[in-house]
Amino acid sequence: MKTVLITGFEPFGGEQVNPSWEVVSRLDNAIIAGCRVVARQLPCVFGDSLTVLNAAIDALSPVLVLAIGQAGGRTDITVERVAINIDDARIPDNRGRQPVDEPIVAEGPAAWFSTLPIKAMVSAMREAGIPASVSQTAGTFVCNHVMYGLLHKLRDIQDVKGGFIHIPYLPEQAAAHPGAPSMAAETVRQALEIAIVTALHVETDIAVTGGATH
């Protein structure tokens, strides 16, 4: 049976939970679209996160890798379009590291684009009644670090799709951040199942607008 690798992060930035791991862990050992889903937690640490991710890819030989992260303040499930080759941390990671304007891969390309059918994934989520959109930036913290590192690793591995999805706060987190949007864990789980099915089945992305004016 083919394998799908899906990752989430440990809590960071003073939060007690990270919605990415809270939801991703629920998918561990699930069978979706004929594939076994394996969930792995990544440390919210520059460098170490990619060490754990790369080891999992090497051990599992997945056909699809989805990295999931928290984006507090976003209202939608946001499927990332691109990762850039820069670490520029507004806050320290979980080991106190705070790189500023450092490349993720020395002499690497400026950016890597997701190899997922990002617009088809967003469309399928919306059809299921789940708020979703394409995101034009994964930030410059550990999420972008992981997305760039993932796509850089997959560049020489044939027939493996990969990319990154940001998810909102859970309601219990938003309660501590008055006015912040949130999404229930079960809704996010449904969205990630849709993302997996769509990514596995759609080879050519749909041609619909997903851009932004700013």
From Swiss-Prot:
Which Gene Ontology molecular-function terms are recorded?
Answer: pyroglutamyl-peptidase activity
Going by the UniProt record, its keywords in alphabetical order are: Cytoplasm, Hydrolase, Protease, Thiol protease
Question: What are the record's GO terms for cellular component?
Answer: cytosol
Query: Where in the cell does this protein reside?
Result: Cytoplasm
The UniProt entry, under Pfam families, shows: Peptidase_C15 (PF01470)
GO-annotated biological processes? proteolysis
Q: Which domain of life is it from?
A: Bacteria
Top EC group? hydrolase
Q: Which PROSITE patterns match?
A: PYRASE_CYS (PS01334), PYRASE_GLU (PS01333)
Where is this protein chiefly located?
A: cytoplasm
Give the annotated active site: 80, 143, 166
Enzyme Commission number(s) of this protein: 3.4.19.3
Q: Which reaction does it catalyse?
A: Release of an N-terminal pyroglutamyl group from a polypeptide, the second amino acid generally not being Pro
Q: Which InterPro entries match?
A: Peptidase_C15, Peptidase_C15-like, Peptidase_C15-like_sf, PGP-I_bact-type, PGPEP1_Cys_AS, PGPEP1_Glu_AS
Query: Record's family?
Result: Belongs to the peptidase C15 family.
According to the record's subunit comment, the protein's assembly and interactions are: Homotetramer.
Q: What does this protein do?
A: Removes 5-oxoproline from various penultimate amino acid residues except L-proline.
The cross-references to HAMAP family, in alphabetical order and at most eight, read: Pyrrolid_peptidase
Protein name, please? Pyrrolidone-carboxylate peptidase
Q: What species is given as this protein's source?
A: Citrobacter koseri (strain ATCC BAA-895 / CDC 4225-83 / SGSC4696)
